Amino acid sequence: MKKQHTPLRRRFLKKMALITAGCFALKNGEVNAVTENKKSAHSSDFAIFIKDLLSKKTNYIGEVICVTNYNVNKDILESNISLFRSLPPKAITPDDIIYIEGANCIWGRVFDSFLNVEWFGAIGDGVTDDTKSIEKANNYAHKYELPLHFPTGKKYIVNGSFELDVAKTSWHGGDNSILHWSQSPSQFALRVFSSRSTYSHTHVNNKLALSNLTFLGGGIRNLYDAIAISLGGNEESSSLFSLKNINVQGWDINLFFNDNSWRIKIEDSLFLWGRILSKPNAKNSGECMYFSNCMFADNFSTTELYTGDWHYNACSIDNHEVKVFGDACVYFDNGHIENPGRKNNKFVAVGIYSKDASASVTNSRLIMSKTPKLITTPVFYVADENQSLGLYVNNLRCDQNTNFDPSATDAKGIFLVGGNGKVVMDNIFINIVNSSFIA
């Protein structure tokens, strides 16, 4: 009995597989075959534009074709090549992006790991407003639960605010992929969070949420009065994800850690001119936050942390102060601390401003570079009321210069630390220019 129904069953399964084929990746063999065909194919083998699919007939259901812009004069294929596979007519409703109705079939876009913003009309020429195209692309990325890709070397002009649910999608660029806001959004440029509230399913958050993207706002003298990237919110499990190779500049607040943001890693990233801020009295926030190989610099910018434990490894802070409030604790290790090179006389690198906050600076280097003005502030500060936790400094090399002399003010000769809070210092290596600077 089973043998008699086997051919029928196979035909049924084959038909079902064809209907759903557009939602899945090509097999490796098919991808390789298509790649080889692209190398040797003449322009007649390709649909020149997406619109050509409307009149194109398939030779058989399951046929894979390439759609590209073919430059006859240069006799080359442009890089933006897409693959489409033919599906049975009426197998799925066309949407003119992923599924396009052809002459005798539905042409379904073949994608194995991401969606491309250019499929949705984004240009990336640094002039055209791509907001609507990227909004549509982001909606589809959430719908299909696939990453969204911004091609290399493109600058997308946008405005308004976007949201990224890491339980469903992520954003990734290539070399020098830029998102430039033409005007300040009302609250934030991008909010990153997770809608996955079931604790046993938070493993879906354990991913790279953002990578290889630059978020541009205003200039150094006209920062946008908004948040560039907001992390967390009312959702309970906005955690466990990472940001890598992110560049943020031109915003009053470059990063904002909201409620329910914890165990987030940020690496190989650059933050210029604006603040890094954690929400005061945040709930369920601040557990094991980690910066690795990041740079925070310029414009007297600050990081202001109010709760949680914050780890900095191999980071640089140049003309930037890490301010510790509430019960927050900071661990700065294997880093680089450097004063500003501008005409000013103030430089504090790490300051502790409450009785329950703490910080440690270990295995790091402090460089007091020459500036036109005499720097008169201590590099570290501990509030008077902090008598039990305070600041711990160990294995710090300090390259002192003649333009640094806190004794010229009411610091009264204190070399490294201001305030009367608790300080423990071990293994300080100082390249002394003038020994009178040491208290």
Enumerate the language-model features and the residues they cover.
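Acidic Gly/Asp/Thr-rich repetitive segments characteristic of extracellular carbohydrate-active
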Residues: 40-60, 119-150
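Right-handed parallel beta-helix
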Residues: 203-205, 211-295
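Short, surface-exposed terminal/edge motifs of secreted or surface/virion proteins that either
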Residues: 64-114
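N-terminal extracellular ligand-recognition/capping segment immediately after the signal peptide
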Residues: 45-51, 67-82, 142-170, 174-186, ...
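All-beta strand scaffolds that present successive hydrophobic residues in beta-strands
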Residues: 170-174, 205-210, 240-244, 263-267, ...
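N-terminal secretory signal peptides and thylakoid transit peptides that target proteins
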Residues: 2-20
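Right-handed parallel beta-helix/beta-spiral solenoid domain characteristic of secreted/periplasmic
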Residues: 110-133, 169-225
